[in-house]
UniProtKB/Swiss-Prot annotation:
This is Transcriptional regulator MraZ. Gene3D superfamilies: Transcriptional regulator MraZ domain. Pfam families: MraZ. It comes from the Bacteria. Forms oligomers. The gene is mraZ. It comes from Leptothrix cholodnii (strain ATCC 51168 / LMG 8142 / SP-6). Residues 9-55, 81-124 form the SpoVT-AbrB domain.
Amino acid sequence: MADFHFQGTSALALDAKGRVTVPARHRESLVSLAGSQLTLTKHPEGCLMVFPRPVWEGFRAKVEALPMAASGWKRIFLGSAMDVEIDSGSRMLISPELRAAAGLVHDVLLIGMGNHLELWDAQRQASAEAAVLQQPMPDVLQDFSF
């Protein structure tokens, strides 16, 4: 698997059919890594996770291995997963169900998160970020040097 890392934020807009254009800076990596094959699913924080298909396969295997006590989360991650493809216009189609789950209407943000991307409603992400910034630094970051 090619070495890649998604980072940065792109402000985008959904079109009337629920499609979003994949930015050029991510498109080349997605095409070379996954042949334009992506999987989208719900994220616990109210956005969508966008995985290149090979990365999704690893994530899916981890979810499938969860114990019965996590069956609700398995249902959320696997039951809402949708396979999509980047089309000839460099767009990916977001299903109506996933758009509704993440509150995606028009203005969206595509955020690089290392091995995958997150797709957020722009206003929802701004509120989520403001809430994070109001909290004290978590213990796990106390020794992190800036």
